[in-house]
Structures are given as structure tokens and as C-alpha cells.
Regions:
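ATP-dependent phospho-/nucleotidyl transfer catalytic cores
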Residues: 80, 102-158
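Active-site loop/lid in soluble adenylation, ligation, and acyl-transfer enzymes
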Residues: 2-120
């Protein structure tokens, strides 16, 4: 698959068109950011390591029947992927109370809730990836309630 012109560049990846309109090449960059893009640095081989880890995880999900955009790793820092619609949501699956959730709710880290907890965040450095609820996601036109149900079902499997 031939990598054509750059279609999109983010903080950690570049997306290139290919001759197949249904596929893109994703290149993982050596750039690192922290604190919502305030701190920046280059880390040698970061792109290669992130590509290898991503390829392993996405390949595993595909093998378990969880459809992803991933097709194959085509270079040390590149993947061939299917074109998909990007939904600017981050779904955090919690089976143990930890991190920001423990701090936000004043709970002890390590507690195991009786049910899986899904935190939904709106992706975007300018807002700091704020926590939102299902109704926000639907009202913003990001997803429908039916799509959210599928997202939660798939997230619970992984």
C-alpha cells in the first residue's frame, strides 16, 4: 500500500491517504506531550514502541471479535488501517476505583465496585477532556443512545 499525501496531523500521529479510499496509513510520531499539550518533547523510538503496542492490542481485539480500524503493521512506526468516523469521546472502563475517580469522589483507591463503571470524556485539550454524561454526548450530536449502548457493550468486552 502506497502512502500518499498527509491528510491529518495530531500530537502523536500522522494520517496519510493511500490509493485505496477505504484505507489510510497511520504513522506514530516520536513527539510527547503532557498537561494537555503544555509540555512538549521528542522521545527517540517512541513512535515505534507505540506502534508495536497498538498493533499488538488492536490485533488481539480483532482476533477476539471486537472490530477495530486496524489492518496490519506495515513499518516499525506505521499501521495500515481502515477509514472510520472519529467520535471525540474517551470511554474509561473502571472495575477498580483508582486515579482521578478516587480523587474526584473522595474514595479509597483499590475498592472494587459491584458493577463496571464507565466514565465518558469529551476529547479535547482545549477543555481538558471534561467528564460528560450520556445525555451530553447525545445533545452534542456525537452519538445516539443506541450507539452509546453498543459502545458500552463493546467496551465491557475489552
Amino acid at each position: 500500500m502506497t502512502k500518499l499525501e498527509l491528510q491529518y496531523e495530531g500530537k502523536s500521529k500522522q494520517i496519510y491517504r493511500t490509493e485505496d479510499e477505504g484505507k489510510v496509513v497511520i504513522r506514530f510520531k516520536d513527539d510527547a506531550t503532557a498537561f494537555y499539550n503544555i509540555k512538549r518533547a521528542k522521545i527517540e523510538n517512541k513512535g515505534k514502541m507505540n506502534c508495536a503496542i497498538s498493533s499488538m492490542l488492536l490485533g488481539y481485539l480483532n482476533s477476539q471479535g471486537v472490530a477495530t480500524h486496524y489492518v496490519e503493521q506495515v513499518a516499525a512506526d506505521e499501521q495500515l488501517c481502515r477509514v472510520v468516523e472519529h467520535i471525540p469521546l474517551e470511554i474509561i472502563v473502571r472495575n477498580i476505583i483508582a486515579g482521578s475517580m478516587a480523587k474526584r469522589l473522595g474514595l479509597e483507591e483499590g475498592l472494587e465496585p459491584d458493577n463496571t463503571i464507565f466514565d465518558l470524556c469529551l476529547r479535547g485539550d482545549e477543555l481538558g477532556d471534561p467528564l460528560i454524561n450520556d445525555h451530553h454526548a447525545v445533545a452534542l450530536g456525537l452519538v445516539s443512545y443506541d450507539e452509546l449502548a453498543v459502545i458500552y457493550e463493546i467496551s465491557a468486552k475489552t
